[in-house]
């Protein structure tokens, strides 16, 4: 295939230096309703929440806009393209609703009712439109946090049989398009003491994922699996940042005992003087 003559490319001369700030990456928080996904995301610096569950962020001290349909979705992303210094962290709450807006618009354009199956053409058009939207979002110079509810799915095992797993409520197409951009998928849940934690390493029951290699480590360099979120979003955010910088379980150095040699020598001399008098 012939190349266009006006195309100019250059091979890199140096290795990429990864960002040290977690807010520069693309994250996914998922869990059941009212588990604290949005309130945790609202702790990130200079955030802006596009709220696809209108009213969900109204109780938070945050900057947000309720989004009601696909046309508004495209309009807000276009505005952010024009105002690239508007925020540092963009929160999409929640991403399955964005996909539903997209599919709803496709049905409308194809003259189908909401109860009608979209058919092959509908799924194909929706996939292309949604994929373009995610590309547009990912090119914005902000960190991105997507949220989703949880859902139980039956997964086939390699050796045969199935197992039920908790994962995001994203549909197959939505998940296929978005997953490749996400570095960390954290599942927010409650532990046996009824305290909130974020699981960032997957197991046979929960599909969480940590793509960071040199972060979220314990002092012995084993991976952190769960991050305690405490009793408030502020504590949760603080612990998340500490865990990212490998400081959540940092061993505290024992305090040094300072000895004043001058005073010690004076005390010894005084005791010796007293003994000589005896």
Across the structure, where does each feature detected by a protein language model lie?
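P-loop NTPase motor core
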Residues: 96-176
């Amino acid at each position: 295939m012939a190349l266009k003559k006006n195309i100019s490319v250059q091979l890199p001369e140096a290795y990429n230096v990864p960002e040290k700030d977690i807010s520069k990456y693309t994250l996914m928080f998922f869990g059941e309703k009212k588990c604290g996904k949005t309130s945790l995301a609202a702790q990130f610096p200079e955030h802006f929440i596009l709220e696809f569950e209108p009213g969900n962020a109204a109780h938070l001290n945050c900057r947000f806009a309720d989004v009601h349909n696909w046309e508004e979705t495209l309009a807000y992303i276009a505005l952010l393209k024009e105002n690239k210094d508007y925020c540092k962290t963009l929160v999409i709450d929640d991403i399955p609703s964005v996909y539903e807006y997209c599919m709803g618009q496709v049905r409308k354009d194809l003259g189908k009712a909401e109860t009608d199956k979209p058919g092959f053409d509908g799924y194909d058009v929706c996939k292309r439109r949604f994929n373009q939207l995610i590309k547009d979002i990912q090119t914005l110079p902000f960190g991105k946090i997507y949220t989703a509810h949880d859902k139980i799915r039956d997964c086939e095992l390699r050796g045969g049989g199935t197992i039920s797993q908790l994962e995001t409520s994203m549909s197959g197409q939505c998940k296929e398009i978005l997953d490749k951009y996400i570095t960390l998928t954290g599942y927010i849940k409650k532990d046996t003491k009824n305290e909130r934690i974020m699981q960032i390493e997957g197991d046979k029951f929960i599909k969480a994922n940590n793509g960071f290699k040199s972060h979220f480590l314990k002092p012995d360099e084993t991976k952190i699996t769960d991050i305690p979120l405490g009793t408030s979003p502020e504590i949760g955010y603080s612990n998340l940042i500490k865990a990212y910088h490998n400081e959540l379980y940092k061993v505290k150095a024992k305090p040094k005992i300072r000895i004043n040699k001058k005073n010690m020598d004076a005390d010894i001399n005084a005791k010796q003087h007293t003994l000589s008098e005896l």
